[in-house]
Amino acid sequence: MAGLATFVVSLLLVTLCAHCIDPAGSVSIPSSCCMFFISKKVPENRVVTYQLLNGSVCPKAGVVFTTKKNQKFCGDPQLHWVQKLMKNIEARRKKVSPGVRAMSTKALVQRYPANSTSI
């Protein structure tokens, strides 16, 4: 009976130790990394933004695109259509930015026309 109890306790200790020890060289991959790339071209008007993930954090470099419906998919940054889509999104972003600034300045000027005094 003592032999059986010793065996059970030993087995329990080995099982606990096996779960506590982290194997050497284990790598945790962030959930935001691209593991698979979409194979077909996505219409440009559906995509609103992108995030470039380099190979230093993730095993594969990839581009995470976000659609208007907040769906995310990965593109291979080596593909021509992915590079073109990134460039077009940047162009849209730069095109919108100056207009937004100009409109906000114009709105401030129109909002307070009584600030100037005339003699």
Swiss-Prot record:
It holds the Pfam family IL8. It comes from the Eukaryota. Its main location: secreted. One of its GO terms (biological process) is eosinophil chemotaxis. Residues 1-26 form the signal peptide. Keywords: Chemotaxis, Cytokine, Disulfide bond, Glycoprotein, Inflammatory response, Secreted, Signal. It is found in: Secreted. The keyword Glycosyltransferase does not apply. InterPro entries: Chemokine_b/g/d, Chemokine_IL8-like_dom, Interleukin_8-like_sf. One of its GO terms (molecular function) is chemokine activity. Disulfide bonds join C33-C58, C34-C74. Glycans are attached at N54, N115. The keyword Endoplasmic reticulum does not apply. One of its GO terms (cellular component) is extracellular space. Belongs to the intercrine beta (chemokine CC) family. Chemotactic for resting T-lymphocytes, and eosinophils. Has lower chemotactic activity for neutrophils but none for monocytes and activated lymphocytes. Is a strong suppressor of colony formation by a multipotential hematopoietic progenitor cell line. Binds to CCR3. This is C-C motif chemokine 24.
